Amino acid sequence: MAIISSHILDSVHGCSASGIRVQCQKILNRNGDHLVFEIEANEEGRIMEEVSFEDSGELFYQLIFFSDEYFRKKMAERYSGRQIVREIVIRLVLPDPETVSYTHLTLP
């Protein structure tokens, strides 16, 4: 078992991105992607999910942050629909969970 967690911030409004929808998908070769979990960030803009790994070795995942949907809800009356970024996708290679206890990824 491993835990995938994130603290998501809304830099437009200077607050936590509470309510943003996030998906975690396991990237499979030619068989498409497998949904691992889908969650909404809590009031502090945090997500935390336990994930079980059936395979060993490096595993390929992606986290998808639905930013357009988030801003559409947050700014309903002022939203122009002109977002050029609909989703933010972060692709990860997760090492064997038995060998790493904590990995921190900071994005600018």
Give names to the regions the model predicted:
Residues 99-101:
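Acidic, proline/serine/threonine- and glycine-rich low-complexity intrinsically disordered segments
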Residues 2-97:
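Beta-strand-dominated extracellular/periplasmic modules and repeats
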